């Protein structure tokens, strides 16, 4: 158990030592001087940085002894016996402050104290001097003034004592101590040397004045104005109280608010905030601004002398005393004033961006801002500073609001976990130069200010031009410089609440993001529709930190309706396309796949020409076999040829005669061969001569390879009458599919079967006589 307690003590000691070395003594701040009357109460506020260590560390209030030891009077969860029932310490970790309250003060409470964090004497503390003055009598004249300021005390006298010596005393331990008199212009007390004067305006005056400059804490107390000498001297008791200035504590880069409440009924009075050091005006109600505070200060005026001043982007040189005042003529010292003491903690810098950002025309900048991530209902905002009393809201995360002028140009992003939000502003122009304020509505201390400058340069990344046609795909290409090679690159679609990342793989919406090693990022939108219209951003980021961004707007265009005529390509006559009639014949009569046999006596009723024959071949066959007139091709222009001139007739008949002569010779040769291979066959009383070679081509005996392709081919004309007109158009030769080879015996059997079938049919017709179809 003892070992466990020792370990805990060592851990506490180590934590205290670590935070002391991390923050330093300057990070704790409180009032340097406290002046209070005997019997009154006092509340002393001490400030500390709001880090994860200090929030949960021990807070203490101790009194210094002559030995240098600091005795704890109150701390977190502890109150000493001396303070029992009249003193306590209250911590406010969210605000980074704790308050020590002490009641029923006595003069014994005067002394030196320390308020701090951690362990006593480890450096994380701040010294406070407390002075408890004797309570004045009811007829005492009370004067109040701030430390380091000047006070003028008026002492009246009567006509009876106008010629007597005038003196000014201080009451110390019940005794009167001479400070100055009218016999000498120098102070009698060395503590006031060079700081005090006594004046009588004229011999007829009924008062004299005592002026004390550069007031110190020990100047507070009771004084006596005396005209004459005892026991007939005229006296007046004076109570001088030093006011404790209002304390303001801020972190480097953060903000503070001066709340000034001065009673003034003059509506035309000039309200101002001045620095005590130098006396220069920081800002006033007439628009005057100290150049050192330009762009980071805002004045808000109320009524009856009440106003507030916000200073953002705190710097270490802002530390010091400030004076709120209301003057009728605009001059200091003319009206009521209030002193404020500002302390800037240099140990912690809350800003996330440098005080000055630079951007290029057409480029982008990212303003990073602090906020408290533990407060989920915070409204994160960005303002444009427009003067001493105006700032213009650009974006609000709580309302999802983006000003119309910044549509597609500005978006706010929260970075989870690290208390930072980023505002990206792109498509920069010279008009964007100025000061921008980051604001978290629930913690004004985190308000920061950034100055934006537009300088010459080229923006990056860049986006290629494109055209988005409704219903068609579009690719948008984004190019990055080499400095972003290791950065994460992305496409997103902008909206009022930010910019939604597009998926890295094909999604249901058809959006595709891909990137190659050449630092080119391509956004592909499939079948662009109205839902795809809007602003798209292409950018790079390192973790949660946004880098440069380029923006482009997708707008739909209607598909172009242009009549395009096909180009005229010269055609080789030898390779000319078939005539329309030939194409129709091809469509009606595809390549035959199987054969079907019909009786030889029936003429086929079909409009399908022989697919294997060209137009020239049809003409030749007609010459070879005049009897087969149904398969001959008739020239459509023969009628007009007969009515032509004799020259045309001769030029036509001569070639025809040559063709007929050649045909007659071919027929003679064919018949000579036919006689050698003719066999006489008798079926009943019917006799005929047939040659086996005549049956080699089954089509000459009425066979159809694929009757299903030509339904009309199944109908025949009886009695030698053809009911269908023979096609007169020239046909294009269609290559027949290769036929399976048969043996001679198979071909003979097949031909003989066809012959028997045809013979039976002819015999039946001969017995029954001809019939009309």
From Swiss-Prot:
Membrane topology (Cytoplasmic): 671-773
Record's compositionally biased regions (Low complexity): 632-641
Topological domains annotated Extracellular: 19-647
Annotated PROSITE patterns: IG_LIKE
Residues bearing PTM Phosphoserine: 682, 691, 698, 744
Matches recorded under SUPFAM superfamilies: Immunoglobulin
Disulfide bridge map: 46-115, 155-225, 260-324, 369-438, 478-538
Glycosylation sites (chain numbering): 88, 108, 418
Domain Ig-like V-type: 25-131, 138-232, 233-340, 352-455, 461-557
GO biological process terms, semicolon-separated: immunoglobulin transcytosis in epithelial cells mediated by polymeric immunoglobulin receptor
Species whose genome carries this gene: Oryctolagus cuniculus (Rabbit)
Effect of residue 88 to N: In allotype T61
Basic and acidic residues bias locations: 735-746
Gene field: PIGR
TM ranges: 648-670
This protein's domain notes: The Ig-like V-type 1/D1 domain contains three complementarity determining region-like loops CDR1-3, which mediate interaction with IgA and IgM.
Protein's UniProt keywords contain Cell membrane: yes
Span of the signal peptide: 1-18
GO cellular component terms given for this protein: plasma membrane; secretory IgA immunoglobulin complex
Reported modifications of this chain: N-glycosylated. N-glycosylation is required for anchoring IgA molecules to mucus, but is not necessary for Ig binding.
Recorded GO MF terms: transmembrane signaling receptor activity
Region (Disordered): 619-641, 725-746
Keywords carried by this UniProt record: Cell membrane, Disulfide bond, Glycoprotein, Immunoglobulin domain, Membrane, Phosphoprotein, Repeat, Secreted, Signal, Transmembrane, Transmembrane helix
Subunit comment: Interacts (mainly via CDR1-like domain) with dimeric IgA. Interacts (mainly via CDR2-like domain) with pentameric IgM.
Stated name of the protein: Polymeric immunoglobulin receptor
SMART domains, A to Z: IG (SM00409), IGv (SM00406)
